[in-house]
Amino acid sequence: MVVASEIAKVASKTARDIAGCFTCQCGTQFDNVERIVQHFKECRYRDETCKDDDIVVYEPSSFVQDEKKDKPIIVEAASEATSEEACNSSKERQLPALSALSALSTLTTSANDDLWTARLIWQSTNDTKLDNSPSSNYTDLNHKLANYGLSILSIHALMCVECECLLNVIHTAQHMQIVHKLELNEDLLWFQELRTLKLKSPTNVLQTHSSQTHVYPYIRGLPVLLNGYECVPCTKNGTGFVHAIMDTFRHHVRRTHGKVIKLENCIRRTALQTVKNKYAQRCQFFKVDYVPLNGGEEEEEEEGEEKEDAQNIKERMVDFCFSKFMEKNQQRREQQDKGENKKRQDDVDQATDNNTNTILEDDEKDNDEEEEEEIVNAREKNLLNQQFNWTAIVKKLGENWDQLVRFEYTNGIVTLDTIVNQLIRYYYRGFRHLSGMTMGMRRMFTQGGSYSAQERGLCRLEQKDTVVRYAQSAALYLIFLLRRPSADSGIRRHLEAMCGATVERKEGGSNSSSNISNVANFDSAEDDNDNDNDNDRDSNNNNNNNNTNTDDDDKLAYLELHEALKLAFLQQYDFSKNVQDLEIMEFLACMSLHKDGTSKYAYEISACFAPLIYTCRLVAACELQRLIDEKQIDLLSIPSFQTAGSIAYAHVFCFITLGQRNLYDVLYETQKVVRDIIRTEGYANTLQGLSPSTVLFQPRSNSMYPCIGDAFNNMVRLDLSELTALYEGMFAKVQDLLKELCFDMNVEKLLPISLLRSIGDDINNSKLGYSFFKESIEIRSSHSVLLRTILKNSELCHRFFPSMSKKDLTKLFGGVSDQQRNECDNYSNHYNDNSNDNDNDVFLKLHWSKSAIKKYETKASIFNELLFCLVYISAGQPARAQEMVYWTLRNGKYKTRELYLMFGRLMIYSRYDKTRNMKFAEKPIPRFLSEPLSILALRYYVLVRPLEALMKYVTTADRSKVAVYLDFMFVIAGERLQRDLPYRIFPKATYQCIQKPLGFRNYRHIAHYFKEKNIEEEMTRESYFDLQAGHTRNTALYIYGRTMDNLHYLPSDYFANFFRASYKWQELLQIRDNPTHGLLVETKHPFIKRVDQLEEALNEKLARLVGEQMVEGDKEKDKTNEEKNKDEVKAEMTQPVVNQDSHDLQDQLATTPTAPTAFHYRPGLLQPSQTSVQHCCWALSQYYGLEAKFRSLKQFQSVYFSLLNRMNLITVLPTGGGKSLSFLIPALIEKKRQTPGKVMNMVTLVLVPMMSLRQDMMLRVNEKGLLVCSGNWTAFKDVRLTLETQLPDLFILTYESALTNSGLRFFESLATLGRLARVVIDEAHLLLTSGAWRTALSRASRLSGLYAPLHLLSATFPRQLEMVARQTFCTNFYVLRETSTARENIFYFLHPYDNTEFLLDLRTLMKRTKVFEGDGRAIIFCRTKKDVEYIHRRLHQSDLFAHTHVTIYTGDVSDEERQMNFDAFRNANGKTRIMIATKAFGLGINYMGVRLVVHYGLPASSMDYVQETGRAGRDGKYAIAALFYEKYDSTWSSYVEDSMKNFLNDNTMCVRSFLASEMDGECVCCASFANCVYCSRCSDSLLGEESTVSTMYGVKPTLPETPKPAIATHSRYNASFSSSPPPQPGNSSGMSAMNTNTTSTTPVSLSELSEITLFPSSVSPTWKKSFGNANTNLKYGLEDMSLSHRRGHKRTYDEHLNNVQQGVNHDMNRVHGSVGGMSGIVGIGIGIGDGDGDGDVDSRTIHFAEYKSRVQAVKKQWVDSTDISAQLERFFRVYKDECLSCTLGNPDTEIRAHTGKACPVRLSTCYKCGKADHNLRECKLRIRFQGLCLFCGLTKFEHADSDMAYTSDCRSWARKANLISLVYYAWNNVQYRRTIADKFLQGDVRDQAFYGFVCCSTTTNSAFVLVIHYLLSDVLQIM
């Protein structure tokens, strides 16, 4: 063969410049060609077959030269050129290719070892790919070497790919034979020829990398040790030392640096490599720059290819530019991770400020738990009192005990904030002391004195939040000691000195916050606020604290604080001292109580002990370190430290030794007792299991998402099927969102589901930035798909680039095409030129639409929120929210990723941080997503995330903002998911899907319960479900715990077992399309298999003993049947558990058989039941005597339908029309119906607007003594509600007291038990219209969630309010309305006000109405309280009323005085004749003797006028309603409605006509009534003289009297009634609200009631589910009126529902004869015979179905209302970097760098009115907030729990977004004022109207939210 020296003669000039000489294979060097030829003849390496004629010398002209430079740029360029010439020559001379390669190797491995040569050689190694390029001479050889698993690297070294090591080319054949067992028979000669290659041996590579200070490019194919150790002092000295073994590194530090420098100060992590060699005895490591370059350069176009068109060029350029954009982000990220340890941005002082005033809340709850409702647990309280008698201790402290533990303190220079800040610094200084101690010394401070082998002793706190919380607890104890009367002066003195030193340091200009940040450099990952710039999550592995020295002030402050802590925590008490007198017990006693004095649960109290115990131990450790530093003790005397009499024991260990009567001992023993109580206490009864598939959970009381209609004693029912519905609902939303985010692309075709199984993922790969996304070419090629889709689609292109045409885009990307090759070749140089990076970026040159980007980002944020919830629900047992927010997609600098691919699923492989912190042990927890969710998440990360990153870059022009999209799994509004967001996201998402607000804690309990009851079968100790949930099996079986056992090893089936756990949970949730693809093979346990075999053998033996003779066919048949039966049993047992009660009710009802009835319905009119009429008349007689009659038909209908309990009613009767009887009579009948000893009474809930009305109604009910009523439901709050619980018959409550969360839950419990008969709302028009009850109105819709009919009562209920009522309560109402609101017995008198004649006119009116006679009374209504005082003063001063007593009724009068005045006015024998009051007195006050009502000034509305005039003539006698008005009010007054103004200005309009049109929607007048007193406008007489009226219209001076109001019938109850329907009358009173037939007010007798037709023959479709006849009931969803409506008096809600589903028919207890003997349930037979019907199940079913639909409507309404605030919150998170004031001013403006507060548009104007001539303080506009937070403008429903609402520390999103000022600015903007006024203010553009609207809470949503949402969504359309 030809040796290398022959080819060396063809060396070029370039090669000479590099090497300086020619080298023969034997190693001899030559400087010219002649000498090498002579040497070749004598060289021993010369091949015998080679002759001298073969030696050819090439002329220099044939050499390849570099004309531009004397030296080559990179070695490969010269090498390839030389090789090309060599190959050409070899072809001419037919030389073997191997010889050419040998020559190349000889040239590149020159013996010249100058720096330039070495640098050029190692530049070539930047090509980390194998040397397989087409132009390389290694290509053919590498193809053949690949067959043996070998490859030649670009560093000219031979590598074994399988062993990942470099080989010496001489020993290659031996390596393949011995190590890989290959037989090299024919190829042995070829391996011997490889020896001629001059490849580097491993030794040469190590020698080349001998320097331990330089950083070399890493060698691809060899393993990289990412966490190697580098000696910092050696590196600074220039010598350097690196190693991968900690012990060796420690020996080096001790040997080289001694004990002067601590080991922690020497260590620095770095990436290392070593060349593995079989013959190397010791490993030599060298530092490498671990930055693998991505390939994927664009292939050059081949010659002869046709020119691409513009579209193809654009698409190719987009893909290229996008790939370059992603690579730049990757390299920037890796460079930051590689060497630039950026200073952390979080500030401990800021964190302290943010956590100020939260110590009490933090001590009362766990880190990831939600607050519980404050209720007293008597058993727990007694247990604690038995042990500690804390209640007595608190009593001795006095009434102001809560001030002792108040987290606020300022006394001179001693402030709480200063103490907390210095305590934080003290903790971190103590941590440094602990790091210098050995583990044995730290174990001396172990809690309890006992430790396991894994216990590290007293360790530093991992989380920064924990440090702050512990510091706050210790500070609170110090403040407690200072506040005590007998406070230790020493503690105060030291704290004052400490605060003084702190003040001096601050005045000196030192930055304490930066020092704290440096001290806190090793905070854990949970508290890392890295601003998404890097992936640092500093833990104890990287606690390189450089700032170890502090100045004198810091040292002085530290020493003074240490002395104060010693006095507080290192205490030893006298054994004779009572424990209750200790300061620590007094502190714990105060902390054990809520602010209202109720006891906390034991688990709430337990949070107080850990900070105090840890502080006590840490102070002792610091004191020991002080003794060591001062040389008072020697480390050699460690064994005697805990010996009594030693200095260490006397100063340190006696205070932390148990049994020595010290503070530590008291805390430790108290904690043990509390923990024992916790084990029996549970979790405050928050979860109750009803069945394996049903639970009851207790939601938070202050949740902004209330549970409507499903409460059981404040607990909510949840079925397993609802979890399935929750997952399916969220998954459907996520699918739709992904479709929108991908612009309706066919993602299934682009990224099929098979991709999950085809992508490879190296789980053990710890390379920086590695993730499985890099392993698939499909993924890498799909990053730019969405961007190319935008550019190709015209609609999308216009949406994102509205100002650019397609030609502009094509031209822009076409210009990049010419520079593509240069940019690829000079990529690194281009990237390093940061100054021109943004200018040359093509994406920054595009004119993007910021609104389109924000909308896209908002959708993506919603997607991430739902994806977070889906992962939390379906991945197995739920994880912790604090850990989920840090899950990453790729490997970071100090932690590996959490997202992996395994078993064809996405696997989340997280580490349990809490175990790591406590035990210093890893606890890896795998969770597997379902297959549908896996592919959906994968498509999102592959397609959408790159586009999000690009959009973030173009909006900010900052690549550091892009890293968060490439790193974290969940990104919200451009930031990593914050720690507090999950607690808002999860309840909101669950409420939107299933209308039940599941909190994190609720779901963790529920998931554990369902798992225990449906999946976990064996009581094994190691449960993979419990490991996923974060607790051990033993803990899970007791109290839901937190600690875990160590996992000593990972078995081979570790991941498979977790996969099985996740899959079983997903199977329980019935997740569809989730196959296992055969990966889960459930094998039978060997023991069970053995039992089955024995059973088969036993059966065979028994068969033989019996002697059965079976033919072959019978055997086969029997065997087939047996197998069939086994299969059926197996299939039945393997079916998933399904809750049969949770199916949709309507589906079950469709198949529920009903029993046939004994009669048939007759179409036509329906009539009331005879028995029901009897009962109504009997109850009426109990109230008003035997002669009482119903005043009108409508009144009877109201009573009767209320008794039926089948429909929701609106009863509109005139004042004095007997509306109260509609619930009093049914309540009395139901009370008599109850069965003694079995079922207790039904309850009626009555809501009234005013306290006076409540008192008046309760007084009237109590006077009769027939019913028991109560005005306070809270007295029964703590009573356990059952069917036998004795309750009042009536609850008469005000709106505010009943419509609270706790009140609604109480009545929901009653309704669930079937004991709530009806809900009555008196004066319902006020609830729906008046602003005084806006807060109550926001909760009024929840009344529809009660399983009881609604009954709205009012005398003034306009028809327009009917639609408002339907929308508010989400149901239809049946309306009972009298034809005219105006009363027939009242003379309506209108007269202009004359100040001089007013008193005289008043006296004249009082004489006409005989107020001065008998029990006559007069009421004067005034608009304001000033008017009341004015009239009252004039009457007292006037001689006309000298002998007349006058009283007043206003809001300023106390309750006692109001009640006294009202009693005096109502007393028939009293002297008080006149009541002067505001309109509050006009609501429902029932006094029959009011003869005159006077209005002093105009009422605000027609409803107020009708309501107040209705106080007169309630007994049916003649009365006058006089209105004195001023001309100004009727024209210009702002508080009077326009309708009232028009009415007064039109002198021809009849009063009754006006009231009828406004209230009833009818056109009538005084002449339309057959028997009425004409109004002043229809009468010729000024005052309507009675004689004139009588003469003109033939009526008596006084209307017919009726004894008592309202009511009466005959005393005969046994009258014979016909059971058959009466003949159809010609003209009957219809039920429809549109019926305008007049109805007589003549009392209705019993005989007339028996023939009354209650329902018309036809029903309008408008009133579905409200009324109907027999043949239309089912059509409109009504119950059958012919069936007895039996409520659940004897059964609970569950039994009632089960009976409905199972079709159980209840017996109908009919009652005949006298009411006095009533018992059981009264049937209501309407239009039927005497036979009993069996259709009660259908009746109750339809009623229950209507109720369920009503509840669903209310839930939807509530969700819609809360979703508006959630949308705005999400919007402001997205737009947090933009000034929205500028956006409102000019929607097309560019993104502003300033914030809203610094907006130049806003700085020059007033905050409120927007004017520039004054500032905020000088503004005359006065704004008063009602029901809103003064600092953010939100209602309490819109606040989160952590917002600290209604305080100056409010942290809501609205305050951060300046919502109030933004709305003010929009109103003061001319272009929005008219728009807002038309939308919300009926066109009123006055400032007073606007601020009155936005600053008062009217609904669940704040008006500020409604206004800004309307502007952003409907007007600007940017939401």
Swiss-Prot record:
Domain annotation Helicase ATP-binding: ranges: 1200-1375
Motif (DEAH box): 1322-1325
Biased composition (Low complexity): 540-549, 1626-1642
Induction record: Repressed during various growth conditions, including nitrogen starvation, and by heterochromatin. Repression is strongly dependent on cul4, raf2 and raf1. Derepressed by histone deacetylase inhibitor TSA.
Keywords: ATP-binding, Helicase, Hydrolase, Isomerase, Metal-binding, Nucleotide-binding, Zinc, Zinc-finger
Enzyme Commission number: 5.6.2.4
Catalyzed reaction equations: Couples ATP hydrolysis with the unwinding of duplex DNA by translocating in the 3'-5' direction; ATP + H2O = ADP + phosphate + H(+)
Zinc fingers classed as CCHC-type: ranges: 1804-1821
UniProt record, GO biological process: DNA recombination; DNA repair; telomere maintenance via recombination
Alphabetized GO MF terms: 3'-5' DNA helicase activity; ATP binding; ATP hydrolysis activity; nucleic acid binding; zinc ion binding
Protein name as catalogued: ATP-dependent DNA helicase tlh2
Protein's gene: tlh2
